Structures are given as structure tokens and as C-alpha cells.
Design a protein with these regions (language model features):
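Iron-sulfur (Fe-S) cluster-binding modules
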Residues: 1-63, 74-85, 96-161
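N-terminal glycine-rich "phosphate-gripper" loop used for MgATP/nucleotide binding
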Residues: 87-91
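Short gly/ser/thr-rich secondary-structure transition/capping motifs
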Residues: 67-71
Length: 161
């Protein structure tokens, strides 16, 4: 599973034009939800805040896997009114949307950190293969669905670089 972190709200709105952008927010319900930057909760949080601040949010949807072109086709998203798509997913999901919606501005609002393993019974995930620039994340654990860092290790696994 890919661990990504979402940009700050302030950084996201810097990429938007309040007058011109008609925004669709699409959220991954797998990796991004598990990491706390996708799923219905993060979609609603971002969507409501943008609307409150006067942005034109035309559509919102949750897809099972944002990185899967067959799943994307099966989703039959109706985002014709949008000219801008905010994708709450890892870079693989963002890339899938850029390929399938070349006529729209597709915003990447997350940064990939690395690969993780999950313990769904204890609702935690652990970074086991950080990407370049994120080596300090090796072995760090987080609460699933929120991305909240944990202070003690729960998953017993030796991580080596």
C-alpha cells in the first residue's frame, strides 16, 4: 500500500482560481483513505471548507481505487461540469486521472511517502519502504483512517534500509 500525505489546505487553494475553477473532488477509498487523506471523511472535510469559502464545487465522488483505470471506467463519474479535478489519492491515482481527463486541470495535492504494511485489527500502518527524501519515515507507525502518528511501535517488524 502507498502512504501519501495531503498538502495543507492553504497550499491546495493556492492552486485554485475562485472565479474560474469549477471543481470536482474525487477521493480514493483504499490507500488514501487508510492513510487519512482520502475516503468520504476527507472528501467532505475539503468539499465543505471550499464551499464555505466561496469555491465552486460542482461534484464529489469516492472511487474504490483511484489508480485503477477499469475501476475508474466502471465508476462512470459525471464530472462534465467541472474544469478542475482535485484528486485525493497517491500519485498513481493522480496519474490515472490526468490520462483519462486530459482536457481538465487535475491537481495533485498529496506527496507519496513510501510503502506501508497495515494491521487492520489494531488499525495501524507502518512505513517499511520509504521513498527517496523520506528515509526518516522508516519504521514510523500511524493510525489508519486519520494518519495520526503513533508514539510507540505496535507492529513488530524489523525495518532495514
Amino acid at each position: 500500500m502507498i502512504f501519501s500525505k495531503i498538502e495543507s489546505y492553504e497550499d491546495i487553494v493556492k492552486k485554485l482560481d475562485k472565479k474560474e475553477d469549477k471543481i470536482a473532488i474525487i477521493s480514493c477509498n483504499t490507500c488514501a483513505r487508510t492513510c487519512g487523506n482520502g475516503g468520504i471523511n476527507k472528501l467532505n472535510e475539503l468539499g465543505f471548507r471550499l464551499i464555505r469559502e466561496g469555491y465552486n464545487v460542482t461534484d464529489e465522488a469516492v472511487v474504490l481505487y483511484a489508480c485503477s483505470e477499469p475501476i475508474l471506467r466502471e465508476s462512470k463519474l459525471n464530472i462534465d461540469d467541472a474544469n478542475t479535478i482535485i484528486v485525493l489519492s497517491c500519485s498513481a491515482g493522480w496519474s490515472c486521472f490526468t490520462r483519462n481527463y486530459p482536457d481538465k486541470k487535475v491537481l495533485k495535492v498529496t506527496e507519496d511517502i513510501g510503502l506501508v504494511i497495515t494491521d487492520t485489527d489494531r488499525e495501524i500502518f507502518k512505513v517499511v519502504m520509504p521513498y527517496k527524501g523520506h528515509e526518516s519515515e522508516l519504521g514510523n507507525e500511524y493510525r489508519t483512517n486519520s494518519g495520526e502518528p503513533l508514539t510507540s511501535n505496535k507492529i513488530k517488524l524489523r525495518c532495514v534500509a
